[in-house]
Amino acid sequence: MLDYKIRAGDTLSKIAKRFNVGVDAIVQCNGIRNPDRIRVGQKLKIPASTTDAMDAVVPSVAPPPPPPDGLDGPPINRGKFVLLPKEYMGEVKKKDLIVLHFTAGTSAKSAFETWKNNPVRVATCYTVDPDGSIYELLDPAHWAFHLGVKGSNGKHDKRSIGIEIANVGPLKIDANKPDQLNWWAREWGTRWYRRDETSKYVPASYRGIDFFAAFPDEQLDAVGQLVRHLCERCEIRRKVPAKAHRGKCDLTRFGKFTGVASHQNFRKDKWDIGPAFDWDRLWL
């Protein structure tokens, strides 16, 4: 067991990565109630291994849930990528659902460039870059089309807040270089990473694809903070689908669901948010 004093800029995921242990192990060893509420100078016990974490003293009674993250929320850039009123629906709607997407691209900027000047008003309220930067494109009180559920007249778009996470999504093995994974741009001809760079992708079979791009820790932390902030601000239930249903499209179930879901729950032809996303990192 090691001692560590938190420094400026630290997050639990960064500390865990530095010492090659799991975030859950640090949380368990230190009785941390809210992983986002750590402070500079705070002392932590760092388990040298998973066994150390399992040997740590665990309270017989589960700790209470973490306190709300607060209405101020995480840092959000509300000036860089802003849609014009003509590019979304201005009516105010009560929200009871958050829907996670990935952009199938490399940046928040590329998503914004696709949506601006688009007369059909397709967009999400937020985008999150790989480095964890969060951008608000329109106030979540309003809405835009982001689900594409046929015959619904935008019913679920109106009640939901869409979050696009910059991630290329599905990957395929290069036809001529079996040690390389490509993403879909240029007909699956754009290099992603080598197959031995295993931190950059997740091997998982889903809807005809066997590999998916990984989400960086900084991005996962930012998405979790944003989701919890929106749940607090908009009074959305802090609930995710059961594991057995996270990858399924079921309009009967998800048409009534309130909480946090993903695009794949509403469309059989969509991969997002996919098997590479770690739902536990939402800390709901």
Tell what function each PLM region has:
Residues V27-N34:
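Short acidic beta-strand-loop surface patches of small beta-rich interaction domains
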Residues K17-V21, G31, I46-S49, D139-H142, ...:
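Sec-exported extracytoplasmic/periplasmic mature domains
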Residues P65-P75, E91, G169-L284:
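Basic/polar, cationic surfaces and motifs that engage anionic cell-wall
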Residues R7, I15-R18, G90-V92, N118-P119, ...:
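Extracytoplasmic/periplasmic, Sec-exported soluble proteins
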Residues D55-D157:
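N-terminal catalytic cores of peptidoglycan-degrading enzymes
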Residues I163-V168:
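Short loop/turn segments at strand-loop or loop-helix junctions that form parts
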Residues M1-V21, Q42, A48-T51:
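Primarily a LysM-type cell-wall glycan-binding module
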